[in-house]
Amino acid sequence: MLPVAVVLVVFAVAVTSAESIHQVNPLPRRRRLKGTEEKGHHTNVNDEERVISLESASDLISKLKVKINAKLLAGDSAKPATLSKAQVASVAKEVVKEVKKTPKVWPPPMIKKGVRRGAGGVR
């Protein structure tokens, strides 16, 4: 019981010796944040300039349409119940090629996450 009393006395002396907490540890004044700083360090999406090469994206879409049409002509259904591993691998390889050609065109979090799982990954 004696050590607890000693600790309480020391704490009481320390608190009463300082007139206020702000003298012991002054807090910095906060400045008002600008509109862009409140949202984070990123700029507004509408203010961003993106260079999108529509040729590579349209080429990929046209290649996929050709594959679908070839499957339809061969007698396969347009929407198979499940995709085979070979189908997933072939589409993933094409996507990897396109993403490696123009990585800034594709949205990084979504496409790279799927590509890493599908065909060896993209850095």
Curated annotation (Swiss-Prot):
Location of the protein in the cell: Secreted; Host endoplasmic reticulum
Signal peptide extent: 1-18
BiP-binding: annotated segments: 60-82
UniProt region (Disordered), positions on chain: 24-46
Phenotype seen when the gene is deleted: Leads to reduced virulence on etiolated soybean seedlings.
Motif RxLR-dEER: positions: 30-50
Subunit field text: Interacts with host plant ER-luminal binding immunoglobulin proteins (BiPs) such as soybean BiP1, BiP2, BiP3 and BiP4.
UniProt name for this protein: RxLR effector protein Avh262
Species: Phytophthora sojae (strain P6497)
